[in-house]
């Protein structure tokens, strides 16, 4: 498989092996699209997003692989929104500053949490959508 797909798989495995405050099974997907009825339960999607290749030396390149971790669930109140935002931070804490057990060549570089809450999803559907964008670097 490709480097970015292998990293996304390793992120998925890492999330599924860890213990969090919420019960879920992360899935690697290319298009995390769900019907509202499916979102009664929590969905955590790991999506290969982008790849940027930069020069590292005359013979090597840095491959910066960006992975989105999406958190989605239909919510009834703001208290549940707060719980899921805290859950997203748990995931960020789990991934930051660590190498992936299933892809140790990938070095963690950064995490961005945007949107923390997608306001249009919350307003129109009472659905929380929160996205962590994680960047890993591989020297090749």
How would you describe each model-predicted region?
Residues 1-36, 47-140:
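Charged, amphipathic alpha-helical segments and their flanking helix caps
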Residues 40-46:
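A short glycine-rich, His/Asp/Glu-containing loop-to-beta-strand
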